[in-house]
Amino acid sequence: MDKRYLDKLNQEKFRVEKNTNPYKKIIKEGDELDTEKFVNIFGSPQQKRNYKKTKKLVQNTKESIMKKALQYCKIDNSTSGKYIIKEVLNYSIGSKIVKFIYNEKTENNLFNLILLKVVTYSILTNINENNGLSFRLKKYAEQFTLINYNYQKFKYIDENIKQIILEDQGISEISLHNFYSSVDESINGCLLNILNVLEEIKAITVTKNLMILIKKDEDNKYYKVRATEEEEGIITKAIDDYMAHNKVNYSDLFYKTKIKDKFDRYMKSTLDSIGVISWYRTYEVFIINSTLMNYILDYTDFDERDLPIYYIALNYLFADKMLKNAKNKKEKRLLQKIKSSGNVEQYLKENHIDIENLTRNNFRDFIPSEYVEREKKEMLKITEEKNSKKDFTKLSQTYIEDEETEKISDLILRVEVNERGRIEPLIPLFNLGIDNSKEYERIDISEELLLNGGNRNE
């Protein structure tokens, strides 16, 4: 292992002692606290003063104190005014994990809770002999079905074939570029958020690495290795210089065909000069507290048999979020166009938008009423189905005005469970005339899970 990473790992292991439970000497399993004791132990000074003065615990204050207490112990508050300590933790579980669980009814927290489970499990089951794991974001996004296995393949497919498919599907290249750019950014954001949550509670340490592909003359074989500090400095400087000189963003280097081609040619001379064939970014994850990692799975009621359900849920929630993001961007563009129009009344008339709604700020008011009503019904249906049985395999899709965005989502994000019980893309690339001979890891779902609509009965 590289000495600079080994030194950091040893430093992080030393810091684990700081993540201890300060309440272990105050409470124990089986303790039954009344409201006053509950507030005095876990409340802030201000919360304690307010309770002492009023002898009342308002709901917002109770929730705030409970969220803090749940970082250190499991509590049963099924009986009003009684707080039974079910278990005292050795380490703090962290406020963000408690938030994911406590506010599970919101889609964002539910998504983060499920992602936390599968990321934690994946790290624990894939670590190497050094207690570490190379974590490539897109690889794991595919494994967790945030995206389907069309995603990376279609991004880098031959441009002539891509154009044929885009024309066949009625998708513009700019829409595809914007969607890929947005999704890539979201993949990075949501996965790094979970890694940061685990790092904050001293369960893991994360290092961003630059990996390179080289060829060794002695055996004429290719190897993926971590770049040295000198190699990383040369490659990073070349990228920064190119972006500054050509006034382009980082994402443009990989999504816009003409820019990417020029960038690749520019980088080739730099890479050749240091004997490198290609490069990519990855994250090195090291476990520094495996006890806490395992406890997170227990605390969040993780069950390995539920992994297929988690994957289906993640795909639904992530794809739905991406469609909403795309729609919001379209709304903002239209609002800007309306505001910049010299003749607002004429613009609204030509676009069949009600002039009376101009004074309202919410874009939804500009959408024809039948679309609004349809969307409300869809959202109500989704909420009812989720609250009743959380059957993610049967949730209806939120209505999105932009059909082009829906087609892109179906192609590179959405998955379905086929008749063989496997999670596969909604639109397989081989159905579009693409050689799909490459073997991909598929996720099998047991017959029992399918029969129960994705819900496993205990």
Where are the regions a protein language model picked out?
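Electrostatic interaction modules used in gene-expression and signaling proteins
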Residues: M1-E458
